[in-house]
C-alpha cells in the first residue's frame, strides 16, 4: 500500500509479511492482498483489527515473464517499437527509435547553480568557485564547509583540477514545467550531467528535447529547447528522461538522434518514403499525450520506458505533435489568455502584500497575494496535467518564497522575493493558461479520433 500525500504524489510503499513455515512443503507459494493506496494509519489499523486472518481474502499469484508480481499488464506493450535501448545507446545494437537518451541534469547543489536572476547566480557561483579554489590550495581551509560538497566534486578536488568562473557557462534551463531558470552548466559543479555534453550545443537553436517521467506514479511529458533538470517531472518516484532530436560528435557536428533503423521501421509500416525523422519526433510527442495510450499502458508506464504504437493516419498525429511542440516550447510567445485581474488595497498595518500563490479550482481563481487575484480561469486549464500537477500549479509552486535549505545560501544569498517577479508571473500564468486550453483542445481531438 502507498502511504503519503496523494496530491503531491509522494508516498512510501508499506508491506506486512506473514511467513508460514512448513518443513514438508515443496517449493513455495505467494498470496497477496492489497489495501487502497494512501489509506491513513487509523484506517489501516481498523482494517486489520476488524478482519480475521482467514477472511483477508488473499490471492495466489505468480510473476509474469518480465518479473512483475503485482500490477501485471495484459496488453501488447512488448510488441510496440522500443523508443530506447541500453545496447543501442552503448553502440552495441540498433533496434531502437532513438540512439541516445539521458536523465535530466542532477546538479547535487541546485541552490548554488540555479537562480531566477543571472546576477544573483553569478554571485553564488563566484563564491562557490572561490571556496573550492581556497580548499584546493589548503585542504584545511576554515571556510571549506560553506559550500555543498559531494562525491564528484571531492573527486575533482583530489585530482587537483583548477576552476574559474566563466560567464558563458550561464545558460537558460527548464528547471520545472514552464519554469525557466539560469543554470551554471559545468561538468565539475553539476554533480551528474549524464549525456548532456553529447546532446546539448548552445549554438544550435534547432535542437529539441522530449522529457518524460519514467517509473513515476503519474505519467507526464513536456518538450523544451533548453537543458532539462532531473526533477522537472519527478513526482512519486521515477526519473526525468530526455529524448533529443539531435546529438553531437566530439567536434560539435550535429547528428540525427533518431536512428536509421527507426526511420526504416516506420516508413516500411506506413509504406511511405516521405516520412522524415522530424516527423517521427513529432509523432512520438503526440502519442505520449494521447489519453487512450496512457490509459491502456498505465501499468507499463509506471515501470518501463514508453514504446511506440503504429496509429492510423500517421500524418495527423505528426501534425498534432508539431502543434503541441510549438505550444510547449514557445509558451512565452503565445497570446496571453484574457483573465480578470482584481486588486484590493493593502490593509493599513501592511507594508507589503503577503505572497500566497494558491489555486482555487472550484472558483476558477488564482490568489497571488493579499492584493491580487486572477479570476475567470477556464476549467479546461486545470485539466492539462504534467504528472501530479497541472501546468498552472507548477508555476505557482516554483515562485513561492521558500527558505533555502543550504545554510550558506540562506545566510548570504537569500535574495528571492516574489514581489520582484509578480508582474512577470502574472504574464506567465496568462500565457500558460492559453497553452493549457489549446493543449486540451488537441488532446480531446486525439480522444475523439479513436474508436
Model-derived regions, located:
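Sequence-level detector for compositionally biased, low-complexity segments
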Residues: 1-451
Amino acid at each position: 500500500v502507498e502511504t503519503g500525500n496523494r496530491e503531491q504524489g509522494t508516498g512510501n510503499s508499506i508491506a506486512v509479511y506473514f511467513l508460514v513455515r512448513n518443513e514438508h512443503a515443496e517449493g513455495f507459494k505467494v498470496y497477496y492482498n492489497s489495501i487502497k493506496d494512501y489509506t491513513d494509519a487509523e484506517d489501516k489499523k481498523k482494517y486489520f483489527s476488524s478482519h480475521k486472518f482467514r477472511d483477508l481474502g488473499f490471492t495466489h499469484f505468480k510473476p509474469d515473464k518480465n518479473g512483475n508480481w503485482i500490477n501485471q499488464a495484459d496488453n501488447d506493450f512488448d510488441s510496440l517499437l522500443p523508443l530506447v535501448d541500453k545496447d543501442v545507446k552503448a553502440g552495441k545494437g540498433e533496434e531502437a527509435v532513438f540512439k541516445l537518451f539521458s536523465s535530466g541534469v542532477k546538479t547535487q547543489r541546485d541552490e548554488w547553480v540555479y537562480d531566477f536572476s543571472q546576477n544573483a547566480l553569478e554571485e553564488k557561483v563566484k563564491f562557490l568557485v572561490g571556496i573550492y579554489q581556497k580548499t584546493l590550495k589548503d585542504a584545511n581551509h576554515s571556510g571549506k564547509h560553506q559550500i555543498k560538497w559531494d562525491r564528484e566534486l571531492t573527486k575533482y578536488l583530489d585530482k587537483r583540477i583548477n576552476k574559474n568562473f566563466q560567464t558563458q557557462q550561464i545558460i537558460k534551463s527548464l528547471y520545472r514545467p514552464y519554469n525557466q531558470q539560469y543554470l551554471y552548466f559545468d561538468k565539475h559543479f553539476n554533480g551528474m550531467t549524464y549525456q548532456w555534453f553529447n546532446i546539448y550545443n548552445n549554438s544550435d537553436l534547432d535542437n529539441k528535447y522530449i522529457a518524460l517521467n519514467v517509473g513515476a506514479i503519474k505519467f507526464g511529458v513536456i518538450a523544451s529547447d533548453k537543458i532539462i533538470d532531473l526533477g522537472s517531472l519527478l513526482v512519486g518516484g521515477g526519473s526525468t528522461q530526455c529524448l533529443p532530436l539531435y546529438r553531437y560528435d566530439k567536434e560539435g557536428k550535429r547528428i540525427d538522434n533518431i536512428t536509421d533503423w527507426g526511420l526504416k521501421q516506420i516508413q516500411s509500416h506506413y509504406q511511405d518514403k516521405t516520412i522524415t525523422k522530424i516527423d517521427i519526433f513529432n509523432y512520438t510527442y503526440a502519442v505520449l499525450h494521447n489519453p487512450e495510450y496512457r490509459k491502456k499502458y498505465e501499468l507499463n508506464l509506471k515501470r518501463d520506458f514508453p514504446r511506440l504504437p503504429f496509429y492510423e493516419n500517421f500524418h495527423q498525429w505528426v501534425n498534432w505533435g508539431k502543434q503541441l511542440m510549438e505550444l510547449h516550447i514557445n509558451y512565452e510567445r503565445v497570446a496571453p489568455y484574457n483573465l480578470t485581474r482584481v486588486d484590493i488595497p493593502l490593509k493599513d498595518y501592511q507594508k507589503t502584500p503577503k505572497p500566497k500563490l494558491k489555486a482555487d479550482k472550484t472558483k476558477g481563481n488564482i490568489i497571488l497575494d493579499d492584493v491580487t487575484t486572477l479570476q475567470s480561469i477556464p476549467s479546461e486549464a486545470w485539466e492539462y496535467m504534467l504528472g501530479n500537477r497541472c501546468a498552472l500549479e507548477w508555476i505557482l509552486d516554483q515562485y513561492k518564497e521558500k527558505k533555502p535549505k543550504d545554510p550558506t545560501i540562506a545566510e548570504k544569498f537569500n535574495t528571492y522575493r516574489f514581489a520582484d517577479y509578480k508582474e512577470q508571473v502574472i504574464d506567465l500564468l496568462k500565457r500558460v493558461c492559453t497553452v493549457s486550453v489549446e493543449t486540451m483542445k488537441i488532446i480531446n481531438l486525439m480522444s475523439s479520433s479513436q474508436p
